[in-house]
Amino acid sequence: LNKLEHSEDEYFEGIKDLKVSCHLLINRTGELLQFVPFDKRAWHAGESAYKGEVNCNDYSIGIELEGNEIDPYTDEQYISLIKVTRELINFYPKVNSQNIVGHSDIAPDRKTDPGKSFDWNRYLSNL
């Protein structure tokens, strides 16, 4: 499993004291970095709720995409995201296109990602 080296990037240094994690990070080149095993809790959602269930960290898989909410995500990121999601759908019966949402859906008062530049149709139609 991977770990962000805070000294490698000024941004990482600024967030080193935050108590957050994700299962996967997909960087701009499409590389997958796993930080937490899928069967363990990652701390990506915070205070959240989905379909009446609270604490989404307890039962969800958190995949982060490197980027911001303005610039489009890369083709490589979509390719990797679609590929890994297909694998998760095959392995976990409860994972399906109807249960895939963004942080903005489960914590709308606090989170805005993946943002307006994320192409949900491109992603979900290719699963």
Language-model regions, residue ranges each:
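Active-site-adjacent loop/helix surface patches within enzyme catalytic domains
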Residues: 1-94
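Basic/polar, cationic surfaces and motifs that engage anionic cell-wall
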Residues: 68-127
